[in-house]
């Protein structure tokens, strides 16, 4: 999968009509946003990312902008796509609601505060990143699979049952099977 396309391949696969490719790309885009939102500080989401707005090539038609490819990502907000955010099976609906859900989770848990301790844990796979955020109330483990294959994160946080904040499912933080371009936000109270 080529990740150099707009929005992790959403643009490329959308124009090709490749539904499986679009679904994978949406999952990858959500995983990247989940990683960003699990970090300390103020997350910045560029205008249009929340609805899957693809690159705008019209800058090439303006002689004052044509030589500066940064305008590729600086097109006007595509308001015609915005209503699709309320349709669950569209790219816009999937991205908008996933980001909204992640933002709500982040604002509801103190473990995302800047005062939380942060460290990585080894997953024994270079395509999987696992981070731990911890404070006096909660322990969070973010697991991110940046591969196009299902993988096992060989972690062994043997300290109780965790809830995946994204899906609501309970699981142990040991040998976690993670789907291609997928992620888990595991959390438990102390």
Which residues are covered by each model-predicted region?
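C-terminal beta-strand-rich structural cap/linker in extracellular carbohydrate-active enzymes
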Residues: 172-190
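Generic "edge-of-domain/loop-turn" microfeature
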Residues: 84, 138, 148, 160, ...
């Amino acid at each position: 999968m080529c990740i150099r396309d707009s929005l992790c391949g959403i643009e490329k696969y959308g124009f090709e009509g490749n539904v499986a490719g679009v679904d994978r790309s949406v999952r990858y885009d959500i995983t990247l946003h989940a990683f960003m939102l699990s970090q300390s500080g103020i997350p910045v989401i560029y205008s249009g990312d929340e609805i899957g707005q693809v690159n705008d090539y019209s800058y090439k038609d303006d002689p004052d902008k044509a030589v500066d490819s940064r305008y590729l990502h600086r097109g006007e907000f595509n308001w015609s796509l915005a209503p699709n955010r309320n349709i669950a099976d569209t790219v816009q609906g999937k991205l908008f609601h996933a980001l909204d859900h992640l933002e709500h989770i982040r604002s509801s848990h103190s473990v995302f505060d800047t005062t939380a301790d942060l460290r990585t844990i080894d997953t024994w796979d270079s395509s999987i990143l696992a981070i731990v955020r911890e404070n006096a109330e909660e322990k969070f483990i973010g697991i991110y699979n940046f591969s196009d294959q299902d993988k096992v994160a060989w972690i062994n946080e043997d300290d109780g049952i965790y809830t995946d904040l994204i899906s609501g499912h309970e699981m142990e933080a040991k040998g976690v099977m993670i789907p291609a371009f997928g992620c888990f936000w595991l959390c438990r109270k102390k």
